Design a protein with these regions (language model features):
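Generic signal for short, ordered secondary-structure residues
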Residues: 65-66, 74, 88
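S-adenosylmethionine/decaboxylated-SAM
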Residues: 69, 80-183
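N-terminal pre-P-loop "Q-motif" helix
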Residues: 75-79
Length: 183
């Protein structure tokens, strides 16, 4: 019963926050439109959560659900909406992710660019290993590179250009310098 009670209370809280947003919610707003309201960060987050539930394309929602399963990725629903709004507005030609876990962000960028029909060349720098930082714990039994490839295949997306090393390695520094990045 505690789990059900928590879900109900969370949903009531979510609806209350949606109601208090000082904007028109009958149609999706672009990032530029959203900025004109001068919302604080919390309200922007709440709008992204609202956008996820009411306006985000089903394919992007499915992407989120896929990465929630088996802890394939981190973050919250609102982050998928945030990336959608950012890429919709910025339409980056070259995007770089530094530190790939299992490919959630790079597949999301590619998926959104496919949905919005613009070309985005995605690259990444990552050792694709269980080596972590002082706050992260990674599973040793996962081949992170193969898992990232599998996740790209699941969404029928090509693999990005990969620099397979730590971001502090000279090879990574040269890789970053070799291109002009939009994101």
């Amino acid at each position: 019963m505690t789990g059900l009670k928590t879900k109900i209370l969370n949903e009531l809280s979510r609806q209350w926050h949606y109601y208090r947003l000082p904007l028109e919610k009958s149609h999706p707003l672009t990032l530029s439109e959203l900025r004109r309201f001068g919302l604080d960060r919390t309200s922007q987050y709440i709008y992204c959560d609202y956008y996820f539930r009411h306006f985000l394309p089903a394919e992007v929602k499915k992407h989120r659900q896929y990465f929630i399963q088996d802890q394939r990725g981190f973050g919250e629903d609102a982050f998928h909406a945030m990336w959608f709004l950012l890429l919709q507005e910025l339409k980056p030609k070259r995007a770089l992710e530094i530190g790939v876990y299992r490919g959630q962000t790079i597949t999301l960028w590619k998926l959104i660019s496919r949905i919005l029909q613009f070309e985005c060349s995605v690259s990444c720098i990552s050792p694709f290993s269980s080596a972590g930082d002082s706050v992260s714990n990674y599973k040793n039994e996962i081949d992170y590179f193969e898992d990232t490839k599998k996740n790209h295949l699941y969404f029928n997306l090509p693999m990005p250009e990969v620099c397979r090393c730590f971001s502090t390695d000279p090879q990574a520094v040269e890789f970053i310098k070799s291109k002009k990045w939009d994101l």
